[in-house]
């Protein structure tokens, strides 16, 4: 079946400027073109031809002033083409809608990122200025910790959505892992890894020296017990006069500071309440894990932490800062409640560290061993038991090494250097001088040895050997006290300090669409 449609097009004749006919001024003379298009309805006989466009020859008929073009063009619009067109339009509209929704999501994310960055820009400025670490004080100087404070600040900065803190890490969580990480990064940024390399080579020596100190301490106890057994077996006692063993045993019972401090040195008597320190109280805790962003600690972290502590806190030889304690580094090492107790604990540790090389030197020096045997023979003259004499000689060597260690620590606390490994020239204490140690006749201040180690070097060793978790928590305790007393922040608490946070957000888009996403931020 065919239906013909005639479309007539009229065009102006060339050369006719006014658009009026020469014969009829009131009528416009135009050329009429006739284009007849046949709409073809397919039937069963010519289905194959339904997919073809058929054109017939066009003929131009000239009729005087008019030119008429006649002919036929057959056009077809199939169901397939219609569906294709609909699908194409649907795809375009779907892509447009998807892009629009994605753009709305991006705007919400941008709002949230901006708000989170603004909140983390509100770090505690005194903490950064004096201790070079970043943290938000979640109490906001109110004295009360609340995560709602952080959510309110997010809303204030434009993230007015349904927000919930999915995970949060405070400074005191995980034994101060976050604080230690920031302290280490500060040291690497300021000094570089090369600064730590010069100490990393000594760490194995320090560990070995600590192990040897434990072994020699056990050996000393075993030697003392063995001598007592021998004496008990003979039902005798060593004489009390001119007895190095008894004299040194008495020195060990006396306060160590009486032996090692320079004459007329005034010891700080400042104290703190141990129960108020983060190490001993119940602290605020965060929630959630940050295993995806946490770094593994190691030897380097211990060295960096020790360097950070020595740079930011005062020790016995430094000028006091005016905080709750004067000997801050000693507190970090010992954790006692008073300056005196902390200094005593550190001095005892130093004596033990120096005891190892001193005893090893005596074991290799035949001259001094001979002196010890002679003194033991004098003590045991009445006993006439060789085993007792030999045990007493070993006991005298141990006592002599202890006395030399006291002299070494006295040297260190005087701000001088002591030899790492002793020789005849650097050995300070004679056997006769051992009997004067701790008496009125004891006037030696210790000899300064060029190229040796000073007090700060040994403190660095002690910091490395101490447990990192304890050091970190005590360090944060000193910071808290200093912030409260020195830097006029009475409500500051270290367990209110936030360093990492992830926020879960739900927002409403148009037409009831909900969008959930997470935003993480942490100080690096």
Write out the residue ranges for each language-model feature.
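Generic structural motif recognizing short loop/turn segments at the entrances and edges of beta-strands
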Residues: 1-6, 33, 114, 164-167, ...
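N-terminal leader/signal peptides at the extreme start of proteins
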Residues: 1-17, 23-25, 29-74
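Alpha-helical assembly-interface signal, strongest on the long, hydrophobic N-terminal helix that forms
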Residues: 6, 47, 57-58, 63-145
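Long, compositionally biased low-complexity segments
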Residues: 133-524
